[in-house]
Amino acid sequence: MANISIADIKALREQLGTGMVDTKKALEEAGGDLEKATEILRLKGAKGNAKRADRSTSEGLVAAKENANGTATMIELACETDFVAKGEKFVALSDTVLDAIAAAGSTTIEEALAAPAGSQTVAEFIGDEAAILGEKIELRRVAVVNGEHVAIYLHKTSKDLPPQVGVVVGYAGDDTETARSIAQHISFANPAHLTREDVPAEEVESERRIVKEISRSEGKPEAALPKIIEGRLGAFFKQVALLEQEYARDNKLTISQVLKDSGLTVSGFARFKVGA
């Protein structure tokens, strides 16, 4: 049996992020050859990937970057445990994946997974890294936001974890500070749409039926129902439409007013939260 040094075990663990016991066994099987031991560990991990296929991925991170063409790309990369999520290997993996997807201009999961990452596709690269880390890793979402400018905000819900919430805003105008504060507002308020006109008609009609039934059950006069319903629909739009919302920093102002005062126009946004 080859004499396996502590230095070799340490070097391979630092390179791959594998456990002490698995690393030592692989080196012993490879007769101390670091390259062969790496292949053994990757093969073992690849076999484990199939077994992990049905596992849930409720942890992970959100990452985003501004591109040279006036767009920004954002991804949610998921894993099984917060232990892996906060590790340097997983964060480095997300950086490589994000760079590859942004360079390819991918806008869908299918395009993103097929994007080149060195000599591999993103899907192959993630699979290899999952094999090493010993967890299921999943590219869950990707978004590309366009604008004259873009503002990016990444929020940590815990100092020990990478960003769990990410927002990208496409906008026109010169007030970068207000643009960033709008991104922060979106991370907190979680609007689903930009304007009330963007809310699907079936969603509005469903809400209209609900508030109508609630108003009737409260004994409101039939003659007053139309006005009451419109008022309650207004409250609904404040929840789901960004421009209708009260500004998180000053609830006397709506986002629409803040944008007007700062000379900004928002063209679109995306918000990701890990596991949501």
From Swiss-Prot:
Keywords: Cytoplasm, Elongation factor, Protein biosynthesis. Transmembrane segments: none annotated. The keyword Transit peptide does not apply. Pfam families: EF_TS. It comes from the Bacteria. One of its GO terms (molecular function) is translation elongation factor activity. It is found in: Cytoplasm. This is Elongation factor Ts. GO terms for cellular component: cytoplasm. It comes from Leifsonia xyli subsp. xyli (strain CTCB07). PANTHER family: ELONGATION FACTOR TS, ELONGATION FACTOR TS, MITOCHONDRIAL. InterPro entries: EF-Ts_dimer_sf (IPR036402), Transl_elong_EFTs/EF1B (IPR001816), Transl_elong_EFTs/EF1B_dimer (IPR014039), UBA-like_sf (IPR009060). Belongs to the EF-Ts family. Associates with the EF-Tu.GDP complex and induces the exchange of GDP to GTP. It remains bound to the aminoacyl-tRNA.EF-Tu.GTP complex up to the GTP hydrolysis stage on the ribosome. Residues 81-84 are annotated as: Involved in Mg(2+) ion dislocation from EF-Tu.
